[in-house]
Amino acid sequence: MAQVQYAGTGRRKNAVARVRLVPGTGKITVNGREVESYIPHADMRLVINQPFAATQTEGSYDTLVNVNGGGVSGQAGAIRHGIARALLQVDPDFRSALKRAGLLTRDARMVERKKPGLKKARKASQFSKR
């Protein structure tokens, strides 16, 4: 028997998350590990749960996530974006709540590139007038 699944892809900075929602108990698995061991920061786990909180669906779906690229913050944001997109497939009526919370918008901010002649993207060596 085929199991009902809902999929969504989320992106943030250089991280890409492929998310699958399966009706269940609210367990979140990231790259084959429990979310508590994969993302040790409690505030980042709160970020991941924001779409469920916005739609009052905490504990309704098991979440299976494959995420690669980026750091902890970027991966958490990508997972959040993917969960929000997957919840849209569950029920299109969630769109207004997710949109109001700003969870459907792809955060376009990226790291600014380093420029030649500068130490970092904008940091120049100290200027001496005389």
Curated annotation (Swiss-Prot):
Coiled-coil boundaries: none
Gene encoding the protein: rpsI
UniProt keyword list: Ribonucleoprotein, Ribosomal protein
Keyword Transport in annotation: no
PROSITE patterns according to UniProt: RIBOSOMAL_S9 (PS00360)
Compositionally biased region (Basic residues): 116-130
Record's keyword annotation contains Ribonucleoprotein: yes
Region (Disordered): 111-130
GO CC term, one of those recorded: cytosolic small ribosomal subunit
BP GO annotations: translation
Superkingdom in the source lineage: Bacteria
Family annotation (InterPro entries): Ribosomal_Su5_D2-typ_SF (IPR020568), Ribosomal_uS9 (IPR000754), Ribosomal_uS9_bac/plastid (IPR023035), Ribosomal_uS9_CS (IPR020574), Ribsml_uS5_D2-typ_fold_subgr (IPR014721)
Species assigned in the record: Lactococcus lactis subsp. cremoris (strain MG1363)
Taxonomic lineage from the root: Bacteria, Bacillati, Bacillota, Bacilli, Lactobacillales
Protein name as annotated: Small ribosomal subunit protein uS9
Protein family: Belongs to the universal ribosomal protein uS9 family.
Gene Ontology molecular-function annotations: RNA binding; structural constituent of ribosome
